[in-house]
Amino acid sequence: MPLFKKLLSLMTTLVMIMIMGQPALANARFERFELMWNDATDAERYFMPTEVKAYACGLSTSDFIFFARVVEGEGGDSDENITDKVFVAATVLNRCMCSRWPTRSVIATLQRPGQFEVVDRETHQTHCGRSLDSEWAIVIAYRMVENKEIDCHMVYYNAYGFTGYSRQFINYAYFGGNYFSLLTCQCASCTSRMPDWDEDECEMLPDDYAILRPDGVGPHYI
């Protein structure tokens, strides 16, 4: 066999070995992420690499980064808590699950035109940075939505106030940043998540409601 053909055959074999080995490497990497996450405290998780937090939320690293940048740009900053940022992230997750919304993935929901002020309508990109606070807010939002600690009907917010909102909306929360509202919905998803929900029993969250950073962790926002 000519030398060129031998080299070509060897290169092809090496490429095939690399391709076949990628799933095993990825699985080993994700297993390491899972061990890191499960064996850590929240204070340790807060400072973990972005890719580990993304894995914990079931997102690709690129989607998680985009999500964190939107949360950073849309959510209010506070030295005391990350409540506003968590509720922005939870609003996105609630929209993904509500059957009334046309998008099912986080990235599609974030890039839907006209939904988020910090996302460009034409390019679907954002120029905001991200912080440890905004990354952690996403982690906590996933946790709270899964545990039904935040009303699944919370799918709207703005920074201007409750005045002028549609009559379909129910005032839900204000923490000094955004005004969050509930939307009456009887879709299959919302009904299954909160079967006993009654709009007449909905009340504003108290002013002292707060979602704190892990013990010993100070503010990290841009």
List the model feature ranges, each with a label.
Residues 1-33, 220-221:
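Gram-positive cell-envelope targeting signals
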Residues 30-222:
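Bacterial extracytoplasmic/cell-wall-associated proteins, especially those involved in peptidoglycan
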